[in-house]
Curated annotation (Swiss-Prot):
Family, as annotated: Belongs to the TAF4 family.
Histone-fold domain segment(s): 141-216
Main location: nucleus
Function: Functions as a component of the DNA-binding general transcription factor complex TFIID. Binding of TFIID to a promoter (with or without TATA element) is the initial step in pre-initiation complex (PIC) formation. TFIID plays a key role in the regulation of gene expression by RNA polymerase II through different activities such as transcription activator interaction, core promoter recognition and selectivity, TFIIA and TFIIB interaction, chromatin modification (histone acetylation by TAF1), facilitation of DNA opening and initiation of transcription.
Keywords for this protein: Coiled coil, Nucleus, Transcription, Transcription regulation
Comp. bias intervals (Low complexity): 21-39, 296-305
Subunit structure: The 1.2 MDa TFIID complex is composed of TATA binding protein (TBP) and the 14 TBP-associated factors.
Protein name: Transcription initiation factor TFIID subunit 4
Keyword Transcription: yes
Keyword Coiled coil: yes
PANTHER family with a match to the protein in the record: TRANSCRIPTION INITIATION FACTOR TFIID SUBUNIT 4
Stretch list, region Disordered: 1-84, 230-259, 292-318
Polar residues: compositionally biased ranges: 1-12
Length: 363
């Protein structure tokens, strides 16, 4: 395409206007560059000659000599920091006496040590003088742990020694009270209440109605037994006392006694011949046997006569001692009834024990 002369003239005008507008910017740029060059030249001129020479030669600059450190100033500053007089002055100005505070602290430490020593000595004395526990800690802790687990509690009771000691002491006190009540009930069971006679002032223990009835029954039984024995004597089934005395006079009883002694002597002699190594007694000799045997027979006869004199006719025939007074089998001991009576007074947690006790009494 070919441009017209008018268009070319317009383009020239636009170029001229753009150059006129950019001329002040160019001037400012040139001015700034000239200012920078002048500042660089002034800085370069201010540098020392030695530095310029080393830079031009290509070698590294020599190190400058180190300035000496003043140690006196450092030590003085440390002494100032550690000066106790100034610190004391500041504390004294605050109203605090350091020496008095140190003495108080020292006294407190001594008192604390002495108190700890006394406490340890006291604990050792208490442990040495303390009696062993009534219940063993291991078994008691195992029993409490079993009951606690049944109620949903998980705890190690063996670690708590004070609790175990308290429970052991409580059990000991409860059992001692129970034993005391049992002894009191046993005494009341065996003894009546003494009745004091107002006229004479004497006291007597009345017998119970049961003991009176038992004694009357025993007397009746004795009378019936005597009647029965008399009937047997009359019928000739048993020998009377007169027949027994006649036999004694005739020597039948003596002959029987001598016969038994002879048998016993033969048995001992046979035993000694079978075992000759055994010890021999003096009465086994020929001289001692006769005398010993005769003396023994006489003594036995005398004792039988004496016993016959003291015994009643029916007792001598029957060989019975007659009526005996009733004696308590238990004596002064404690029986199950006493213990059950003491347990019933507790009324708390003793139901199963009472049931088992009465079941044993029934058996």
């Amino acid at each position: 395409m070919t441009s017209t002369p008018q268009e070319s003239s317009n383009l020239k005008r636009q170029l001229e206007n753009s150059e006129d507008s950019s001329s002040p910017n160019k001037k400012s740029k040139t001015e700034t560059t000239t200012e920078n060059q002048s500042s660089w030249e002034s800085d370069f001129n201010s540098l020392p000659v030695e530095l310029l020479q080393t830079e031009t030669n290509g070698t590294s600059p020599a190190p400058a000599p180190a300035t000496p450190i003043d140690t006196t100033n450092v030590s003085n500053s440390k002494e100032r920091d550690q000066d106790t007089s100034k610190l004391n002055d500041a504390i004294a100005a605050a109203g605090v006496d350091i020496q008095q505070e140190e003495e108080i602290l020292l006294q407190q430490q001594l008192n604390r040590k002495s108190a700890e020593g006394m406490a340890s000595n006291l604990k050792s004395v208490i442990r040495s003088s303390k009696s062993p526990p009534f219940l063993h800690n291991y078994h008691l802790a195992a029993f409490i742990d079993k009951v606690a687990k049944q109620n949903g509690i998980q705890q190690n009771f063996l670690m708590d020694g004070e609790m175990l000691e308290l429970i052991s002491a409580a059990c000991e006190t409860w059992l001692s009270n129970l034993a005391t009540k049992t002894i009191i009930l046993s005494r009341h069971r065996r003894r009546g209440i003494p009745v004091i006679n107002k006229k004479s002032g004497s006291s007597s223990v009345p017998r119970s109605e049961i003991s009176k009835e038992l004694r009357s029954l025993a007397l009746k039984q004795k009378e019936m037994e005597e009647k029965r024995v008399n009937k047997r004597v009359m019928l000739g089934l048993e020998k009377s006392t007169k027949d027994a005395s006649k036999n004694d006079e005739n020597g039948e009883s003596k002959a029987g006694a001598e016969e038994t002694l002879h048998r016993a002597a033969n048995a001992t002699a046979a035993m000694m011949t079978m075992n000759p190594g055994r010890k021999k007694y003096s009465w086994m000799t020929s001289s001692a046997t006769a005398g010993g045997g005769s003396d023994f027979g006489k003594s036995s006869g005398g004792s039988s006569k004496d016993s016959g004199k003291h015994q009643s006719p029916i007792i001598s025939v029957r060989g019975d001692n007659g009526l005996r007074f009733r004696e308590i089998r238990s004596g002064n001991s404690i029986i199950m009834k006493d213990l059950l009576g003491a347990i019933e007074d507790e009324k708390m947690g003793t139901r199963n024990a009472v049931i088992k006790g009465y079941a044993k009494l029934k058996d």
